[in-house]
Swiss-Prot record:
<feature type="binding site">
    <location>
        <position position="50"/>
    </location>
    <ligand>
        <name>D-glyceraldehyde 3-phosphate</name>
    </ligand>
</feature>
<feature type="binding site">
    <location>
        <position position="142"/>
    </location>
    <ligand>
        <name>Zn(2+) 2</name>
    </ligand>
</feature>
<feature type="binding site">
    <location>
        <position position="198"/>
    </location>
    <ligand>
        <name>Zn(2+) 1</name>
    </ligand>
</feature>
<keyword id="KW-0324">Glycolysis</keyword>
<dbReference type="GO" id="GO:0008270">
    <property type="term" value="F:zinc ion binding"/>
</dbReference>
<comment type="similarity">
    <text>Belongs to the class II fructose-bisphosphate aldolase family.</text>
</comment>
<feature type="binding site">
    <location>
        <position position="199"/>
    </location>
    <ligand>
        <name>dihydroxyacetone phosphate</name>
    </ligand>
</feature>
<comment type="function">
    <text>Catalyzes the aldol condensation of dihydroxyacetone phosphate (DHAP or glycerone-phosphate) with glyceraldehyde 3-phosphate (G3P) to form fructose 1,6-bisphosphate (FBP) in gluconeogenesis and the reverse reaction in glycolysis.</text>
</comment>
<dbReference type="Pfam" id="PF01116">
    <property type="entry name" value="F_bP_aldolase"/>
</dbReference>
<feature type="binding site">
    <location>
        <position position="105"/>
    </location>
    <ligand>
        <name>Zn(2+) 2</name>
    </ligand>
</feature>
<comment type="pathway">
    <text>Carbohydrate degradation; glycolysis; D-glyceraldehyde 3-phosphate and glycerone phosphate from D-glucose: step 4/4.</text>
</comment>
<dbReference type="InterPro" id="IPR000771">
    <property type="entry name" value="FBA_II"/>
</dbReference>
<keyword id="KW-0862">Zinc</keyword>
<feature type="active site" description="Proton donor">
    <location>
        <position position="83"/>
    </location>
</feature>
<dbReference type="InterPro" id="IPR013785">
    <property type="entry name" value="Aldolase_TIM"/>
</dbReference>
<dbReference type="InterPro" id="IPR050246">
    <property type="entry name" value="Class_II_FBP_aldolase"/>
</dbReference>
<feature type="binding site">
    <location>
        <begin position="233"/>
        <end position="235"/>
    </location>
    <ligand>
        <name>dihydroxyacetone phosphate</name>
    </ligand>
</feature>
Length: 359
């Protein structure tokens, strides 16, 4: 099966009531781990790369790694997604490099640091939608800024994240604005701000509704029942992996991620894409530290890279099962980008709100 657009997977997930983890990648071992887990669980795959990941791996290397995954696992539908595009040009370059889905994050200006106005966000996102949909490529937008409801601070990821602190009005997606944004931009998926942030240090305590607003997802889904919602910064930060890292020389302080059961609540309320990166980074780091500590004379990189694949594969397989993704890859049929482009042109995939549907 060739690379497929994100919309194909999210539509299937919505029809069948499950979510799909979207795993960030920048090297061979990560891609191998994800695809091994997907094959093990019969799960569709969303691979995503940030601007930093594309620079690190190199465009040609990354593109061919993804094509190798498609060739090796022809039975698995795979999406290649641009994560947090800071400007239309970033999204267009991703499309030129065979990405089948892009995120135009207009919640921040092009410097990826300054919170943007609603009007700016709508304009740049709509610009990308017009170009991408003409090619059958899916588009994710974002409304609200990712950051902590405890501190008001964000966590930059590959240079993407606001500086300073924001208030709750900026850190929580407004349901009314969400309706206006989706109708004005026609995005395929909407990333919402509910108190999650990038990195391992998301919460200082086990999150409750006060600092993790799953109820905001429920309200947005009520207003936009046919819009695919996205949770960013949704690693669960497993305690056992942190303990293993620290056992072998790490110094990660106590921290809390997004509990799986809270993500499952979100999936029941329209969340179809769940972004995960930190959990896999922790798995790789734990494996490498353990392997090096147990055999300090070893200098063959394969000695510690092989365990990193195994540890990350375990995390990915667990998320596929926990989110209900498992068992669905074989049920999804190939649909070309050209077919999706025709559907967009005919208005068959237009986004509408619950209120508009009643008119």
């Amino acid at each position: 099966m060739a690379l497929v657009p994100l919309r194909l997977l999210l539509d299937h997930a919505a029809e069948n009531g499950y979510g799909i983890p979207a795993f960030n990648v920048n090297n061979l071992e990560q891609i191998q781990a994800i695809l091994k887990a997907a094959a093990e669980t019969d799960s569709p795959v969303i691979l995503q790369a940030s601007r930093g990941a594309r620079n690190y791996a190199g465009e040609n290397f990354l593109r061919h790694l993804i094509l190798a995954a498609v060739e090796t696992y022809p039975e698995i539908p795979i999406v290649m997604h641009q994560d947090h595009g800071n400007a239309p040009s970033t999204c267009y370059s991703a499309i030129k490099n065979n990405f089948t889905s892009v995120m135009m994050d207009g919640s921040l200006e092009a410097d990826a640091k300054t919170p943007a106005s609603f009007e700016y966000n709508v304009n740049v996102t709509r610009e990308v939608v017009n170009v991408a949909h003409a090619l059958g490529v899916s588009v994710e937008g974002e409304l609200g800024c990712l950051g902590s409801l405890e501190t008001g601070a964000g966590e930059a990821e590959d240079g993407h994240g606001f500086e300073g602190t924001l208030d709750h009005s900026q850190l929580l997606t407004d349901p009314d604005e969400a309706v206006n944004f989706v109708e004005a931009t026609q995005v395929d998926a909407l990333a919402v701000a509910i108190g999650t942030s990038h990195g391992a240090y998301k919460f200082t305590r086990k999150p409750t509704g006060e600092i993790l607003a799953i109820s905001r997802i429920e309200e947005i889904h009520r207003r936009l029942p046919n819009t695919h919602l996205v949770m960013h910064g949704s690693s669960s930060v497993p305690e056992d992996l942190i303990a293993l890292i620290n056992e072998y020389g790490g110094a990660i302080p106590e921290t809390y991620g997004v509990p799986v059961e809270e993500i499952q609540k979100g999936i029941k309320s329209g969340v179809r894409k769940v972004n995960i990166d930190t959990d896999n980074r922790l798995a790789i780091t734990a494996a490498v530290r353990e392997a090096l500590a147990k055999n300090p004379k070893e200098f063959d990189p394969r000695h510690f890279l092989k365990p990193s694949i195994t540890y990350m594969q375990k995390v990915c397989a667990e998320r596929y099962v926990q989110f209900g993704t498992a068992g669905n890859a074989s049920k999804i049929k190939q649909v070309s980008l050209e077919t999706f482009a025709a559907k967009y042109a005919k208005g068959e995939l237009n986004a509408i709100s619950k209120a508009a549907a009643k008119v």
